Amino acid sequence: LVALVIYSVVMAFLLPRVLAGTTAIIPLGVTEFGEVTGPVPLVPGSSNITQSIYMIGNLLCFLLVAAAAMQPDGFRAVVVGMLAYATFSIVFALVDLATYATGTADLLGFMRNAKYTLHNDTEVSGLKRIVGSFTETSVFARSTLGVLGFTATLWLCGWRGRWSGLLALASIVLLVLSTSSTAIVGLPVMAVVLYVSSLQIAFQKVSSTAWLFGVIAPVFVLVLALGILLDPQVSGVVRSYLDTTVFNKLDTDSGVERSSWNTLALQNFIQSWGLGVGVGTTRASSFLMALLSSVGVIGLVLYGLFLYSVYLRPRGVARSFESDVRMAARNAAAGLLVGDLLLAPSIDQGLFFYALAGLAAAVPVRHAFGTPHSAGPGRAA
């Protein structure tokens, strides 16, 4: 991660100047052409600075969380903090729905102060587009996919079962009702991730929750699918909802615009000979396109090594509280990454993602006379 951040910051200042005018970009920030939404020649912009600062901030977040989690008490505190974040995220979503239904949405105006137009009072198929504490429905959905990955995995492992299970269930309901294409596409992906994790948990440790989920989940999905298919009215509603939120999305003005961003981002990658045009220079609508267009092949390799070293490389004691939390952090990061691949305009993945990475990377130091396994924050009865 350190190498990725250093490379990103250096290239953010170097590449837009060295490659100036060699390709057309959709500026992420303000350039010498002002605030524009269409293609302009490659030039440095304000977001080269702001995105570099965000990258440095993400690195500091990762290091601070990893350092705090190196102690058993700190590790447990970070886990509780993650659950608190999940709780507040869901509470804000419920408040968003409640204030909209009662005509008191202005009460949330103190945190909806962005300069651009916010679509936080629109409906799709009769459902309010949920934004919670975020600026857009898609951003809310992306964060909630991460919350689902973390809380559902802890529930499968039996840690804080009532709290984590309730949060996971609430996340699923809110994602379905959010009307976000990110949520509708991301939910099946997370279902597969969580099902594979349940099988892994069931074979590694004694967990009745994981065993029951592994047996019941496929049956539930089959019964639900048959119920929808056999009821013409219900299947019509579901089909209409999917058409509106997913299948017809690319034909909307927003879908066409976002597709053009990705097309131009890929062109930036090719015309820069695989180097990219610098972090914060151009706008995309997919994390992969943003990564390629910003930091090129070298950045892609560094990011892949970061993911492997943090989320995939074995560390610590197997079948322990820490290993369960690492799996939860990995699944949460998978949820966030799914959302990023569908909508991210830049390579900044935010503090939530890098806090999860810090938690996954930490191996708490055992005291000389301590027990070999952490007791964790408590199992559900």
Predicted regions: what is each one?
Residues 1-32, 308, 319-324, 362-381:
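Transmembrane signal-anchor hairpin modules in multi-pass inner-membrane enzymes, especially those
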Residues 6, 13, 91, 96-104, ...:
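A membrane-periplasm/extracellular boundary helix in multi-pass inner-membrane enzymes
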Residues 315-343, 349, 353, 357-358:
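Loop-to-helix entry and N-terminal half of a specific, functionally important transmembrane alpha helix
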Residues 52-64, 77-110, 117-197, 313:
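Alpha-helical transmembrane segments of multi-pass inner-membrane proteins
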Residues 1, 154-166, 311-330:
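Membrane-interface helix-loop-helix junctions at transmembrane boundaries of multi-pass membrane enzymes
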Residues 1-3, 11, 27-93:
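Transmembrane alpha-helical segments and their membrane-water interfaces
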Residues 11, 240-291, 295-302:
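TM-adjacent membrane-interface loops and short helices in multi-pass inner/ER membrane proteins
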Residues 73-82, 159-165, 203-219:
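Membrane-interfacial entry segments at the cytosolic side of transmembrane helices
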